[in-house]
Swiss-Prot record:
Keyword set, alphabetical order: Endoplasmic reticulum, ER-Golgi transport, Golgi apparatus, Membrane, Transmembrane, Transmembrane helix, Transport
Protein name, as recorded: Golgi to ER traffic protein 2
Role this protein plays: Required for the post-translational delivery of tail-anchored (TA) proteins to the endoplasmic reticulum. Together with GET1, acts as a membrane receptor for soluble GET3, which recognizes and selectively binds the transmembrane domain of TA proteins in the cytosol. The GET complex cooperates with the HDEL receptor ERD2 to mediate the ATP-dependent retrieval of resident ER proteins that contain a C-terminal H-D-E-L retention signal from the Golgi to the ER.
Biased composition (Low complexity): 42-55
Pfam families reported in the protein's UniProt record: GET2
Region described as Disordered: 42-93
Positions of transmembrane segments: 168-188, 215-234, 279-299
A GO CC term assigned to this protein in UniProt: Golgi membrane
GO biological process: protein insertion into ER membrane; retrograde vesicle-mediated transport, Golgi to endoplasmic reticulum
Subunit structure: Component of the Golgi to ER traffic (GET) complex, which is composed of GET1, GET2 and GET3. Within the complex, GET1 and GET2 form a heterotetramer which is stabilized by phosphatidylinositol binding and which binds to the GET3 homodimer.
Residues on Lumenal side: 189-214, 300-301
Chain intervals with Basic and acidic residues compositional bias: 56-67
Primary location recorded for the protein, binned into one broad class: endoplasmic reticulum
Length: 301
């Protein structure tokens, strides 16, 4: 399309400059800016220069925008949190049981051929390495083993001993309660003066001098028989002394023996005392039930 013819007489000086500038830019945009520049620079010279290149003919570098969003974005990269990186100089966390196990093995290797009974560090490691519960049946050599089959066996044995101990305690408790209730209601129905009261004159109305003597005789006899059977069964099953290993007193003595080794010699005596104290607790429990029964009976009088 040809450019319109404009009468230059009617144009002002500013419009003429604008038209010249537009014509010059139109010529430059056709890719001949470099040739025209070299032609201008070569005027008046016998040698034409061709080493100059116009900025209009230079190729523009493609600029990449970092702010453009990708066409497809994987949401899992945003929703999945990155793995925790430990601080510099810090390794991955280890199992505390494995750490104590390794320290105990190293201490045992150092103490081979020497007496480590007075070594506080070795005693601390043994105390941490022992498993809680009635596991005194497990020797110290098996506690330091790494065989998974043997470890599983000891865990099952520990669970069985705990279950067996609770089962036998429940059985004896049930028998004691039934025997005491039968003894009480038998004498209550067979003896007319078998009653209790808060008032002295009511108790003095009894025709017999000791109306509850037979009841307490049978009660004491049954308690002695049940306590003896309890001790015999638990001792034969190996649960009598094992049940006291979790006592807070023995744990405190184990910790104190690291400072005072003499306490270690008193632990068997304390464990035996705790066992007999448990037998005494059985008798006290039966007496408590009798007191409750007589207290309920006193409301009727």
């Amino acid at each position: 399309m040809s450019e319109p013819v404009v009468d230059t007489a009617e144009l002002s000086a500013e419009e003429k400059k604008r038209l010249l500038r537009e014509r010059r830019q139109a010529k430059m945009s056709k890719g001949k800016a470099t040739a025209r520049l070299n032609n201008i620079l070569s005027q008046g010279s016998s040698v034409k220069t061709s080493g100059v290149k116009s900025v209009l003919d230079q190729e523009k570098e493609a600029t990449s925008s970092h702010d453009d969003d990708p066409e497809i974005q994987d949401i899992t990269e945003i929703t999945t949190p990155p793995p925790r990186t430990p601080p510099i100089g810090e390794d991955a966390p280890q199992d505390i049981d494995k750490i104590f196990q390794t320290m105990l093995q190293q201490q045992q290797q150092r103490g081979q051929g020497a007496n480590t009974a007075d070594d506080p560090f070795a005693q601390i490691m043994k105390m941490f390495n022992q498993t809680e519960g009635p596991d005194s049946l497990i020797n110290e050599g098996s506690a330091s083993t790494q065989d998974p089959t043997e470890i599983k066996y000891h865990q099952e044995l520990l669970e069985y001993n705990t279950y067996n101990q609770k089962l036998w305690k429940f059985r004896f408790l049930l028998v004691r309660v039934l025997v005491t209730l039968f003894n009480f209601f038998y004498h209550y129905t067979s003896i007319s003066d078998f009653h209790a009261s808060n008032y002295a004159y009511v108790r003095d109305l009894s025709s017999e001098e000791y109306p509850v003597r037979d009841f307490f005789t049978w009660f004491a006899t049954s308690e002695v028989v049940l306590v003896a059977a309890y001790y015999s069964v638990f001792h034969s099953l190996g649960l009598f002394h094992a049940a006291n290993q979790n006592s807070i007193i023995l744990k405190v003595m184990s910790m104190g023996s690291m400072i005072l080794p003499q306490l270690e010699s008193y632990k068997p005596l304390v464990a035996r005392f705790l066992g007999y104290y448990e037998l005494l607790g059985i008798v006290l429990g039966g007496l408590s039930l009798v007191i409750v029964l007589f207290g309920l009976l006193s409301f009727a009088n």
